């Protein structure tokens, strides 16, 4: 009996040992296979993971690596559809809409990064760009921006921009009062140490002068201006840099996709160009079909009479050469049209690059303060008196109450126009935007 028990214990121990050994071999084999598989996967420039704080930042001496977008889990993808069935009668939502101009509740739920759909035309996927292109300084100005929207702007740039083209991101805090934009922002930006500069204005400068401050700290070949509530798309920067590399006097902007203010859903936009009317109100115009003829089709750069002010790229030295912004303009409003006219009339070109896509939250218009309204009028009048020549009467026909409103000293800007040898506004109408002159004849 005793011998039988000993034999049972012996064979039981032997069986357990064999199964343990087999399990170890199986797990080791899986580990090696996974390691070999991962070792052959290319890494993106910033190795984006699920959370920003898990990313590894490489120095500028790293060998360029191709783009790879990490696949997200079903849980992550669900984040992108938040808000489709959102209760829009929520009082908290209403208050936040008034404060920020978009759905902050969903913005917080999305967190500090997400993957957006690739909205480029399929022909864009066949394009290849040189490995040597100008470097870019990204300038993002903000005042009391919602934290998550701002950080998604930054993280999307870091995740989807090759580090060998990205000189720096310059954040200009225009005297924000929101606590989240102070120590909390600094803490999270430590993830991107070495690529981020943050400048905190000691007084409220307004968007125009804040951008000038950011540009003055830039060291990249190209200035890229972004609003503080954007999300860049795949291969967004290379098409812009490539266009500028071919023509240093070309100012370019991406196609602007819409991020819905209520749902924060990322929606593709059609190919359109920037324009304006005699009230100097910016608008989007359809592109003529003949402009997309030829082998490039819908990927061909589109001449644009004007641009909206929030997102564009310009060679830094050229920006300085043509007079930057009018520093005597206040806050924001009109600076985009003034720069558009100056580019075209003074020897440059303005194009939309369809293969570059950037999403932008189309904020709900919040109530403008009297200071903002006064600043916008002031800015428009400076534009009118410097650049419209005899056509300024078309503006005053529509805004007669502004004809005798003061607009400050424009001597410096008039002299700039003479020094640059700029063409007349009539030339602009004849060669760039004849549809605007045609509207005079119809009225």
From Swiss-Prot:
Region of interest called Catalytic subdomain A, as start-end residue ranges on this chain: 133-243
Broad class of where this protein is predominantly found: membrane
Regions crossing the membrane: 5-27
Tissues showing expression: Expressed in testis.
UniProt-annotated glycosylation sites, renumbered to this chain: 87
Domain of life: Eukaryota
Full protein name: Inactive polypeptide N-acetylgalactosaminyltransferase-like protein 5
